[in-house]
Amino acid sequence: MSASPKNEMWVVFKRLMAYVVPMKAMFIMAVLGLITYGAVDAAFIAFIKPFIDEGFSQTPAIVAGVDLPTHGGFNANKDIMLMAPIAVILMFSLRGVANFVSTYCVSYMSAQLIMDMRQQVFEHYLRLPVSYIDRENSGNLISRVTFDTEQIARASGSALISIVRDSMTAIGMLGIMFYYSWKLSLCILVIGPIMGVVISVVSKRFRKVSKQIQSAMGGVTATTEQMIKGHKNVLVFGGQKTEVERFFQVNDRNRYQNMKLAVAQSISQPLIMVIGSFALAFVLYAATWDSMKTDLTAGTFAAILGAMLAMLQPIKNLTRVNAEFQRGIAACTTVFELLDTAPEPDNGVFSIDRVEGKLAFDNVTFAYPGQEKSALNGINFEVKPGKTVALVGRSGSGKSTIASLITRFYGDLSTGDIRLDDTSIYDYQLKSLRNQVALVSQQVTLFNDTIANNIAYAYPGEVTREQIVHAAELAYAMEFIDTLPEGLDTQVGENGVLLSGGQRQRIAIARAMLRDAPVLILDEATSALDTESEKAIQKGLDNLRHNRTSIVIAHRLSTIESADEILVIDQGKIVERGNHSELIAQAGIYANLYQMQFSQ
């Protein structure tokens, strides 16, 4: 049985408060400041009764049970009138100090909480399996770090201020009313449950709509990100109108969800005020009763009336901030669901500095998560240390899947095993396993940094300038790097947008060379190069593959003629195998592909 919404909210709130525990000193100071702020407001209203009853009367004044002395011709009511300005200045000075302390402490906690939560979400992304990232909307993933954490900050910040301060003020005002006339104040007990029902119903609505707003905001982020990444394609294919319409739809959906929240909020606040007005009207009416007149003085009535009026604003604030609080709770639920997602399994215990590089696939069958059809069926091959195996086949045949399984990017196999140096890759610690592999894929990823830092990214320790230059030379990247004004210190832009496709590919190859891993995966590593560059860099790749176990995925068959073994993959199965000469002699799929490429 699932937990009720109220219990779920309480569980989420307690988990959120766990982030505040390291800042308990700040939290205590903030609460004390908020309580003081509310108490001063209550004290100011409480001061109305003695000010009116005693300050304007001709009888000795008693304030806080103490007879005020008379002196120098000034009677008691004169002393009350002299005390009032001083009391007001002192109270509001204390109120100002309390407001500063509480606001600063809450702002500090909110900023720290949002930083800690964003850091935790970001780090958790790095531990999640590739399959999770594949199936999730990138806009939603980004929204978790940006939009959702902002909503949480509001719940922990402005909502906390209002809940503590306004609750304290409302309780203080209620206490004053019952202290001065419990009979006249009983009407509050009648409207209290009605207000509670309204707030409960509205809270559920706020929480539901808030989750819909988060989803809509994820759509806005995803659509914007997609347009920016495909900006050139949008322009060249004239897709501006399509993109504008697509963004309008997600943008309008986000507006609609926000309006649903605004409607609920705009209805709830006046409704609370109307309910409160009935209580106020009842007090005014009850004050005319003969039974009440004997207990009421002008000061008592003014204090009760002032307390009721002063209590309406905190109640209104609590209703208003309830929307922010529910949005924060909804965002917390989404973020905590993400943080509760199981990280990439890492049950291996075996660790090694460097393997020899013997790689074997033993009857491997694999299906992607959520897919019934197997991507690979009964794959068997072995690569001896320092040897090269090339994978050839149509797009979608399973070549990249084989490469992804070597690094354990995806979960367990359906059948079979993959061994590295006669040890199952699932027995290795993930970090140790991936330290043995260098990868150059057809989708080059460069970071918004210098060329030098992008090349050095894959190196596990400190790297010298000479090592970076040497790797770039082997990748034939120095040819274009030397022509740049800042050389290796040139900024490449986001994902290398300031470089050509071939230049980005060479930097990626230089990065793999610098890593110096015993196992090398080249997934269409020369696909973005022109013919002249391909011939030049092929020499560098031949040097890179020397004494390294290499898995080469290629469509250009000219780049794999020297491979020790070539596997032809079709529909997840190995349909042909052998070296270049043997496969040509077989006159099968490989021979046909080779003939087609070289006849063009």
Swiss-Prot record:
Any single GO CC term annotated in Swiss-Prot or TrEMBL for this entry: plasma membrane
Enzyme Commission number(s): 7.5.2.6
Compartment(s): Cell inner membrane
Catalytic activity: ATP + H2O + lipid A-core oligosaccharideSide 1 = ADP + phosphate + lipid A-core oligosaccharideSide 2
Family, per entry: Belongs to the ABC transporter superfamily. Lipid exporter (TC 3.A.1.106) family.
InterPro entries registered for this protein in UniProt: AAA+_ATPase, ABC1_TM_dom, ABC1_TM_sf, ABC_transporter-like_ATP-bd, ABC_transporter-like_CS, ABC_transpr_lipidA, P-loop_NTPase, Type_1_exporter
Binding positions for ATP per the UniProt entry: G393, R394, S395, G396, S397, G398, K399, S400
Spans through the membrane: 28-48, 80-100, 182-202, 267-287, 295-315
Quaternary structure, from the entry: Homodimer.
UniProt main location, coarse: membrane
Keywords assigned: ATP-binding, Cell inner membrane, Cell membrane, Lipid transport, Membrane, Nucleotide-binding, Translocase, Transmembrane, Transmembrane helix, Transport
Encoding gene per record: msbA
Domain notes: In MsbA the ATP-binding domain (NBD) and the transmembrane domain (TMD) are fused.
Residues covered by the ABC transmembrane type-1 domain: 28-327
Membrane association type: Multi-pass membrane protein
Role summary: Involved in lipopolysaccharide (LPS) biosynthesis. Translocates lipid A-core from the inner to the outer leaflet of the inner membrane. Transmembrane domains (TMD) form a pore in the inner membrane and the ATP-binding domain (NBD) is responsible for energy generation.
Domain ABC transporter: 359-596
GO MF term set: ABC-type oligopeptide transporter activity; ATP binding; ATP hydrolysis activity; ATPase-coupled lipid transmembrane transporter activity
Pfam families xrefs: ABC_membrane (PF00664), ABC_tran (PF00005)
Listed name of the protein: ATP-dependent lipid A-core flippase
